[in-house]
């Protein structure tokens, strides 16, 4: 467990590297990998078709590939990276949290949420998190390691398979939105997260063919990485986990603020919004008597007025051992009104998965 305020930007050394996976490679690299094991390069396209378009991970389903080649191709490009430990469901089974055991025994979680008009999946980009926010269960656990691109992508592939096969009530469906808001700070695992976005949005069969506009990447505010992300040319939405409008409080709630202050973080966010053409999201967990004062709502509204932005207020979800709790309804209402008075769009997030510790800030990946 990290000390209060301690930050970890680089994953601890010594972790075993995940096996190479199809999703880790570009289409050209997949052909090279297939040729390197003595198979014809076009097998790479067939394998991509099975994985990205049919969600078929089992070689027995690859009927257009000779039986003698399947095991070799699986070992080289589609190894078993992760297995399901368990599913926990709530909201009439329309919210499902999955606990995964990775190849090295590390545990991570993802959450699938079906609404009447859309399906959203919240995925993890790291095992644990090094940002050490004191109100977040993931942050309090510390950082174990980065996930590979393949480990990130496979969470979504499995979610899409589950939706197609009718495992979530409501009939077959397709993912509408992906949010990098599970375990980890996505921009601290920059290269692999960017690789995952490419694999998710490349047209089938090279990727999953999802829209960049349906993807949200959350960050506590790693300013250099936000500038770098703007250079990628993506149309994804950026969400900044702000949680306080003033540096004095944010230094405590979001320790990375001791490196990059609120103004620097927001300026980087405005640059991303301008270059991507997407509205910036501000995430703000409302904590009783800590950051939910109406004057802080007013200050936040003044800072955001006239900008391409939307504020998502999140009633604090309970975590084991936490001394904090959600705001009183009257304080939440006053906070919303203080922001809205400046013409800034603001909503209170519909909290899903709280009963199964699957809501924002609750992912801890334990087998208890």
Swiss-Prot record:
Q: What else is known?
A: Reaction proceeds by a ping-pong mechanism involving intermediate methylation of a conserved cysteine residue.
Extract the PROSITE patterns matched here: RADICAL_SAM (PS51918)
This chain belongs to which protein, by name? Probable dual-specificity RNA methyltransferase RlmN
GO CC terms, sorted: cytoplasm
The disulfide bonds in this chain are 122-360
Transmembrane helix among the record's keywords?
Answer: no
Its catalytic activity?
A: adenosine(2503) in 23S rRNA + 2 reduced [2Fe-2S]-[ferredoxin] + 2 S-adenosyl-L-methionine = 2-methyladenosine(2503) in 23S rRNA + 5'-deoxyadenosine + L-methionine + 2 oxidized [2Fe-2S]-[ferredoxin] + S-adenosyl-L-homocysteine; adenosine(37) in tRNA + 2 reduced [2Fe-2S]-[ferredoxin] + 2 S-adenosyl-L-methionine = 2-methyladenosine(37) in tRNA + 5'-deoxyadenosine + L-methionine + 2 oxidized [2Fe-2S]-[ferredoxin] + S-adenosyl-L-homocysteine
In the Enzyme Commission scheme, what number(s) does this protein have?
Answer: 2.1.1.192
Query: Source taxonomy lineage?
Result: Bacteria, Bacillati, Actinomycetota, Actinomycetes, Kitasatosporales
For this entry, list what GO says about its biological process: rRNA base methylation; tRNA methylation
Domain named Radical SAM core is located at 115-355
Instruction: Please give the CDD domains that the UniProt record associates with this protein.
Output: Radical_SAM
Protein residues bound to S-adenosyl-L-methionine: 184-185, 218, 241-243, 317
Q: Which family does it belong to?
A: Belongs to the radical SAM superfamily. RlmN family.
Major subcellular site: cytoplasm
Give the residues the record marks as binding [4Fe-4S] cluster. 129, 133, 136
| Active site (record annotation) | 109 (proton acceptor), 360 (s-methylcysteine intermediate)
Q: Which organism is it from?
A: Streptomyces avermitilis (strain ATCC 31267 / DSM 46492 / JCM 5070 / NBRC 14893 / NCIMB 12804 / NRRL 8165 / MA-4680)
List the molecular function annotations (GO) for this entry. Answer: 4 iron, 4 sulfur cluster binding; metal ion binding; rRNA (adenine(2503)-C2-)-methyltransferase activity; rRNA binding; tRNA (adenine(37)-C2)-methyltransferase activity; tRNA binding
């Amino acid at each position: 467990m990290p000390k209060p305020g301690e930050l970890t930007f680089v994953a601890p050394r010594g972790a075993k590297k995940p096996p190479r996976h199809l999703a880790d490679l570009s289409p050209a690299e997949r052909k090279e990998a297939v040729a390197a094991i003595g198979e014809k390069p076009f097998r790479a396209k067939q394998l991509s078709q099975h994985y990205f378009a049919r969600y078929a991970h089992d070689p027995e389903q690859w009927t257009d590939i000779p039986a003698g080649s399947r095991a070799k191709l699986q070992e080289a490009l589609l190894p078993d990276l992760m297995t399901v430990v368990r599913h926990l469901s709530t909201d009439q089974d329309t919210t499902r949290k999955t606990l995964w055991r990775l190849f090295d025994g590390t545990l991570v979680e993802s959450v699938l949420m079906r609404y009447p008009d859309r399906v959203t999946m919240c995925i993890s980009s790291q095992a644990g998190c090094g940002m050490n926010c004191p109100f977040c269960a993931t942050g309090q656990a510390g950082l174990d390691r980065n996930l590979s691109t393949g480990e990130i992508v496979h969470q979504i592939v499995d979610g899409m398979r589950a939706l197609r096969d009718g495992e979530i009530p409501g009939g077959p469906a397709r993912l509408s939105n992906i949010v990098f808001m599970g375990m980890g700070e996505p921009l601290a695992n920059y290269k692999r997260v960017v690789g995952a976005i490419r694999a998710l949005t490349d047209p089938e069969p090279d990727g999953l063919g999802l829209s960049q506009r349906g993807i949200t990447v959350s960050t506590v505010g790693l300013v250099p990485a936000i500038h770098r992300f703007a250079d990628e040319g993506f149309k994804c939405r950026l969400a900044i986990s702000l949680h306080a409008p003033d540096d004095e409080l944010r230094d405590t709630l979001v320790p990375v603020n001791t490196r990059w202050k609120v103004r620097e973080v927001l300026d980087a966010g405005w640059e991303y919004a301008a270059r991507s053409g997407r509205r910036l999201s501000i995430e703000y967990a409302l904590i009783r008597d800590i950051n939910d004062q109406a004057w802080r709502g007013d200050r936040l509204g003044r800072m955001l007025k006239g900008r391409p932005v939307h504020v998502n207020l999140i009633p604090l979800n309970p975590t084991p051992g936490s001394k904090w709790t959600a705001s009183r309804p009257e304080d939440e209402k006053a906070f919303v009104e203080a922001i809205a008075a400046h013409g800034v769009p603001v909503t209170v997030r519909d909290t899903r998965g709280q009963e199964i510790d699957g809501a924002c800030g609750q992912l801890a990946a334990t087998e208890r």
